[in-house]
């Protein structure tokens, strides 16, 4: 694995440092279609704005994973949306229609944490339940190397966009990421 240079962090092969990952992420790592690196961070800097300020990683090299609850006829479907940190997921429009839901919104924090087994602020598409749709913005899929959560607030993963787009349940969805107003 070639060394990764992204911001001021020291990136290490994730497969050699499973202790830095959330349990579901560590379990899913062997199934990835490509490489992943991990870097330890201060837990207080896990949120995107604080992370980019603290470590000099541009927001354009970061992808956010949001958990969405889509409802129709009393049934709730959970899904993940993966968009660049410079955009927001079109949850109420495109995501709602794509999932065939009457209503879609961000899943409550307690639900997102319980259903993913990951820490809030560290939720990542790697290691999500296999039944979940993982909607990926084309800009994420095309990214050379993107920073995503690691399942904990104490580290981040760097993963090629193509690896994220090849995750189980992943579907590249044009128009998912919308410019932030």
Where are these predicted regions, by residue range?
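Extended, low-hydrophobicity, polar/charged segments
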Residues: 1-181
């Amino acid at each position: 694995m070639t060394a990764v240079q992204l911001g001021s962090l020291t990136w290490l092969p994730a497969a050699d440092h499973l202790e830095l990952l959330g349990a579901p992420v560590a379990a899913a790592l062997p199934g990835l279609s490509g490489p992943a690196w991990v870097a330890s961070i201060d837990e207080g800097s896990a949120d995107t704005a604080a992370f980019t300020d603290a470590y000099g990683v541009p927001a354009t090299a970061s992808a956010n994973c949001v958990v969405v609850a889509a409802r129709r006829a009393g049934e709730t479907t959970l899904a993940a949306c993966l968009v660049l940190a410079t955009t927001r997921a079109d949850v109420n429009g495109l995501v709602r229609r794509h999932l065939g839901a009457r209503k879609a919104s961000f899943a409550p924090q307690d639900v997102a944490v319980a259903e993913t087994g990951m820490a809030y602020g560290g939720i990542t598409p790697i290691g999500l339940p296999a039944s979940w749709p993982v909607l990926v913005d084309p800009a994420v899929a095309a990214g050379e190397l993107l920073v995503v959560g690691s399942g904990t607030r104490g580290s981040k993963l760097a993963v090629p966009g193509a690896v994220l787009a090849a995750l189980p349940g992943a579907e590249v969805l044009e128009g998912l990421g919308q410019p932030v107003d």
